[in-house]
C-alpha cells in the first residue's frame, strides 16, 4: 500500500533530478525518506505531510509483534480481523468507531488488501515504537518541508519536531484549520503549499 503514497516530479530530462513528496498517509513518509537517502543529490526537495511516527507517550505505541500478528491473521484467512487489528493498533482508532467503519463499503476493499498491511508495518519499522527516531537511518541533505495540520493530534506535531532535528535542511509548516485528513479533504491546500513554499 505504501508504494501508492509516493510520487515524484522529474526536474530536467530523463528524470535525472527529483522533487519527492509524500502524498498520502502511513508509510509513504518513510518511503520518501528512504528514496531521498538512496538518491542523494538527485533529490532536490522533499515534502512530507504528517509522518505518523510515535516517538513518545503521546499515543500508545504499535506492539512489537505487530507485523507477526498481521501475518498470522491473513494467513488464517481472517482478513477482516487483520484490518481491524491494523486500524486499532496502527491507526489508533477507538473500538467504538470500528463498528461504523465495518459498515462502510470501503471495509471490503480494505479486506481485499489486508495482506499488504504487513508491508506497511515493515516499512515503518521501529518508528512507531514510542522510542526516539533512529539518528542514522536517513541521510537527507535536500531541503525538506514537513507539513502538519493545525488541528491534528499531538503525535503528528511531536513527530515533525523530532524529524526536523534530524534533517539539516528541514522546516515545519503548519496548515491552518487542517488535520490529518487534509490529504483527502483539502488536497488543494497541500498542493498550493508545495508549489508556493520555497526552501
Predicted regions and their residues:
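Active-site loop/oxyanion-hole signature of alpha/beta-hydrolase fold enzymes
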Residues: 1-23, 27, 192
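Conserved serine/cysteine hydrolase catalytic core
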Residues: 106-166, 171-177, 182
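Post-His helix in hydrolase/transferase enzymes
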Residues: 159, 183-198
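Helix-rich cap/lid subdomain of alpha/beta-hydrolase
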Residues: 51, 55-108, 119-125
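Conserved hydrolase catalytic core segment
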Residues: 15-60
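Structured catalytic cores of enzymes that bind and process phosphorylated ligands/cofactors
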Residues: 1-2, 23, 30, 82, ...
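Alpha-helical elements of Rossmann-like donor-binding domains used by nucleotide-donor carbohydrate transfer enzymes
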Residues: 5-11, 69, 81, 85, ...
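Short, well-ordered alpha-helices that flank and scaffold nucleotide-derived cofactor binding pockets
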Residues: 34-41, 165, 192, 196
Amino acid at each position: 500500500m505504501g508504494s501508492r503514497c509516493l510520487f515524484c516530479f522529474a526536474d530536467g530530462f530523463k528524470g535525472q533530478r527529483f522533487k519527492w513528496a509524500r502524498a498520502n498517509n502511513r508509510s509513504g513518509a518513510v518511503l520518501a525518506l528512504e528514496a531521498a537517502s538512496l538518491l542523494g543529490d538527485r533529490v532536490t526537495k522533499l515534502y512530507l505531510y504528517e509522518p505518523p511516527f510515535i516517538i513518545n507517550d503521546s499515543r500508545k505505541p504499535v506492539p512489537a509483534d505487530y507485523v507477526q500478528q498481521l501475518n498470522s491473521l491473513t494467513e488464517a484467512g481472517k482478513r477482516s480481523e487483520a484490518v481491524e487489528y491494523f486500524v486499532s493498533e496502527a491507526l489508533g482508532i477507538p473500538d467504538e468507531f470500528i463498528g461504523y467503519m465495518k459498515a462502510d463499503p470501503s471495509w471490503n476493499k480494505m479486506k481485499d488488501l489486508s495482506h499488504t498491511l504487513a508491508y506497511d508495518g515493515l516499512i515503518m519499522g521501529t518508528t512507531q515504537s514510542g522510542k526516539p527516531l533512529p539518528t542514522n537511518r536517513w541521510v537527507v541533505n535536500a531541503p525538506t518541508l514537513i507539513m502538519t495540520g493545525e488541528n491534528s493530534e499531538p503525535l503528528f506535531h511531536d513527530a515533525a519536531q523530532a524529524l526536523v532535528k534530524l534533517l539539516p535542511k528541514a522546516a515545519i509548516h503548519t496548515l491552518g484549520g487542517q488535520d490529518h485528513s487534509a490529504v483527502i479533504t483539502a488536497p488543494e491546500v497541500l498542493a498550493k503549499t508545495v508549489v508556493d513554499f520555497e526552501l
